[in-house]
Amino acid sequence: MNALLTNPFKERLRKGEVQIGLWLSSTTAYMAEIAATSGYDWLLIDGEHAPNTIQDLYHQLQAVAPYASHPVIRPVEGSKPLIKQVLDIGAQTLLIPMVDTADQARQVVSATRYPPYGERGVGASVARAARWGRIENYMAQVNDSLCLLVQVESKTALDNLDEILDVEGIDGVFIGPADLSASLGYPDNAGHQEVQRIIETSIRRIRAAGKAAGFLAVAPDMAQQCLAWGTNFVAVGVDTMLYSDALDQRLAMFKSGKNGPRVKGSY
C-alpha cells in the first residue's frame, strides 16, 4: 500500500491501544497546527457544531499533515454527497454524528466505499485524497485505510446498539454525552448517575463486540473513568474551552472579583 494511504490511528484501534485526543472547534488552520504540535494522538476537527466549511476543513487537514497527530473529521451529518467531499479533501477517519439505526450505519459505510462495495462517487484525479491522481491504484487500496466511527447519542441509538455494532465497516462507536443525556431526560447533566450507568454499560458493550469505543470528556476525572471502563479513544478537551478557561484564569490573576475558570457545557 502507498505510504500516504496508511492509517496509524485505525491500526492502533485494531490493536486496542489507548489514544488521547483533542476537540478542535476554533475553525482555523493556525490553531489546528498549534494543537498538532502538542503531541495528541488524534485531533477531532468539528464540522457539526463548529462553523467549518469544506474549505476550512481542507486547510486544517493541510495544517496538521506534517505532524503525528491524526485528524478525524466530524461532518455536520452523514449524507452521501458530504461524505464524498470530506473524503476527497483527504480525510481518512470520519466521525458521523446522530447514527440511530443499523440501516443508517450501512448507508454511511456505503457512502465511504467505491463501487462495487459502495456508492462513493469517483473523482480521484481531481482529489487531494489521491494526490490528484498521483497515487497509483488509489481506488483499489483506499478502503483498507479508511476508518469509520459513528456516534450513538440517543435512546433510539442505544436500543439499536447491538445491530449497529454488527454492521461491517464500522470501526468504532463514539458515545455523545451531551445529546445522549438530553435524550434520556437529563439535559445538560451527563454526570447524572443513570446517565453514567448507561455510558459505562454502552462502552463495555462496544468493546465486547470487538469495536473501538470513544468519548469526549473535558473533566479529567471523567476521562479517567471512561478509560477505566475500556474506552480506547478519548478526547480530553476542547480547544475553544481551554482557550476560554485560560483567558479567565489569567484575568483572575490581575482583577478582583473573578473566580477563575469554570467547566462549561455538558461534556
Swiss-Prot record:
GO cellular component terms, semicolon-separated: cytoplasm
GO MF terms, alphabetically ordered: 2-keto-3-deoxy-L-rhamnonate aldolase activity; magnesium ion binding
Magnesium keyword on record: yes
Transition state stabilizer, annotated site positions: 74
InterPro entries tied to this protein: Aldolase/citrate-lyase_domain, HpcH-HpaI_aldolase, KDR_aldolase, Pyrv/PenolPyrv_kinase-like_dom, Pyrv_kinase-like_dom_sf
Residues that hold substrate according to the record: 151, 178-179
Keyword presence, Cell membrane: no
Enzyme class: lyase
Residues given in the record as Mg(2+) binding sites: 153, 179
EC number: 4.1.2.53
Annotated site location: Increases basicity of active site His: 88
UniProt entry keywords in alphabetical sequence: Lyase, Magnesium, Metal-binding
Superkingdom field: Bacteria
Cofactor field: Mg(2+)
Active-site residues per Swiss-Prot or TrEMBL entry: 49
Catalytic reaction list: 2-dehydro-3-deoxy-L-rhamnonate = (S)-lactaldehyde + pyruvate
Pfam families recorded: HpcH_HpaI
UniProt cofactor note: Binds 1 Mg(2+) ion per subunit.
Reported function: Catalyzes the reversible retro-aldol cleavage of 2-keto-3-deoxy-L-rhamnonate (KDR) to pyruvate and lactaldehyde.
Protein family (similarity comment): Belongs to the HpcH/HpaI aldolase family. KDR aldolase subfamily.
Subunit structure: Homohexamer.
Protein name per Swiss-Prot or TrEMBL: 2-keto-3-deoxy-L-rhamnonate aldolase
Species of the source: Escherichia coli O6:K15:H31 (strain 536 / UPEC)
Gene label: rhmA
